[in-house]
């Protein structure tokens, strides 16, 4: 886990934003790229580079989502009725690991994925161990009784009252939450500007 933490903080510096809004993020004190030439502000970024960086920021925010998975989610969003960008965000935000993270059951998207993959989360009363499961409105998730008291979960949920977004509900005493609705882009608490329009332009080329 330490290796993942170091790697994610390095990603924040490489991409020029705090990807998860973590107070421990090295980007907060060293807001330049890692490496010998990291503080060189004269390096120009091409139009393609700007589009690529917007995609990398969004993809990294969702943890270990592969490029193939990310593209497939985008392709599905294109086929759906309505705005492609809003559909894309709605699909990303309906993933089980994302919802566990947004409810602050886990402190990071990486820890959320581990809780799911280790079988510690229930979906509608049944064990769910696939991070990419897509939730529907009204779905209920809950932490398994056997792990409710572990420090990682208890420390994380202690912060939930201030930060649970409006498209989710969460009850701290029972560690049970509900997916209320598909969020709009403006509902999602990104700690950086999510330039979804640039991602759409990149994948539409």
Curated annotation (Swiss-Prot):
It comes from the Bacteria. The keyword Transport does not apply. Residues 94-157 form the S4 RNA-binding domain. Keywords: Ribonucleoprotein, Ribosomal protein, RNA-binding, rRNA-binding. GO terms for biological process: ribosomal small subunit biogenesis; translation. Part of the 30S ribosomal subunit. Contacts protein S5. The interaction surface between S4 and S5 is involved in control of translational fidelity. This is Small ribosomal subunit protein uS4.
